[in-house]
Every structure is written in C-alpha cells, then in structure tokens.
Amino acid sequence: MLTTLAFDVYGTLIDTQGVVSLLSSYLGDDKAQEFSSRWRDKQLEYSFRRGLMQQYEDFAVCTKDALLFTNNELGDGLTAPQQEELLEKYRSLPAFDDAKTALSKLNSAGIECFAFSNGSADAVTELLEGAELNRYFKDIVSCKDIKSFKPNPQVYQHFLDKSSSKEQNTWLISSNSFDIIGASAAGWKTAWVKRSREAQFDPWGINPTITVSSLSQLIENIK
C-alpha cells in the first residue's frame, strides 16, 4: 500500500517564531523571543485544556486568548491594535527553509502528503498558500472537523478515515513531541523533527520511529 505522510503544520512546516521580528519592533529584541515562546506555549496549553474539558473553540480562539494572557502576564506591553496586527501576522507565517524542497522530493517519489493540523482548514489553506506549499498536499485534515485537538486519539483516527490510510502505512511528521507520542500511541509510524539542539523529547518511554534535524532527511528515511 501507499505510504501516507501526515504533516503537522504549526512548528513543523510553518515557523511560529515568524512573529519575533514584529514583536521586536514593539517590545525590543530582549523581550520579543520570550513573548513569542510564552505565547506559543500558552496556545498549546489552551488547546489541551479545551480538548480535555470538551469545551471546543477554534484554534484561532486559543491563539487569541493566549496572546491576551501573555500580554497581561508580561506587563501589558502591547496595545490592542498591535495585538490585532500580530494575529494578522499569525495568518501568514513563513515556512521553514527546508519545507518546499523536501515536499517536492517526496511528491516526486510518489508519497502522498497531507497537512494535518489543529488549525481550521481555511486557516491552514491560507498559511500554505502564502508559503507556496499548498500544491504539495493531496488534502488538509483539520482536527476542527471533530471539534477536538491533538493528541486526542480520535483526531488520529479521523485522519485515517479521511485519508483512507492504515496505521501501519501512515507517518506523522512533527516537531511537537506531544503530537509524536499521540500518533505513536495510535499505532502510527512517526518522524520527530528536532529543529534545535535544545529541543527535548518527553521521557514517556514512547519514542519516535525516526528523528531528523531537517525535513530534507525524510526522503532517505521514510519507507
């Protein structure tokens, strides 16, 4: 059967730290990276909590609420118009440099690629089109379809149902260890994209099938 790749979007294909330059213009270089990282962490925390509580809201709501929290926590440095500009920037984040070439090679090898995200299909489409990556994907599978978030086991089953793939032939490609562990627990093969030397994998005793430092290494490791 065909090998199917499910690509996480935020943090794997698309650089969520692409807001740092704009934050620097508002807060200065010293505070921008801290703010961006805290915003991202809080965004994911809100998605986890909403998933567990079964109090679903669009991922964009998690993003907006996390921005408000982070601004309050770190000293109310951003005005309301600046926050709106950041949210607009979040809808057009850049792709990582390795994404386009890696996806092109995988397509040429006949490997089916899907985008698989907490974000809505509309939001992911906008991101991928802006980054010129949309043509490499057969489809977008959004967790919004079932009103939950990764790593709920139901979202991994939803992907299999929508892609008509089987666990043993499906790979999750993600830089997020919680996502890798979730997919591994669901019976998938997994490729953890370790984008920095400092990145740590959760010590749960559930390890990725492979670890790569760049998407360019997938073509030689995925079978």
Language-model features: where?
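A metal-dependent, Asp-based hydrolase signature
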Residues: 47-84
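Alpha-helical elements of Rossmann-like donor-binding domains used by nucleotide-donor carbohydrate transfer enzymes
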Residues: 21-22, 38, 65-69, 85, ...
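Short, well-structured alpha-helical segments
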Residues: 32-40, 79-88
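Asp-based, Mg2+/Mn2+-dependent phosphohydrolase catalytic module
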Residues: 1-5, 104, 120-121, 125-223
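Short helix-capping segments at alpha-helix termini
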Residues: 27-32, 73-78, 108, 132-136, ...
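Substrate-recognition element of Asp-dependent hydrolases with the DxDx(T/V) motif
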Residues: 81-94, 99-130, 137-143
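Active-site neighborhood of HAD-like aspartate-dependent phosphohydrolases
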Residues: 1-41
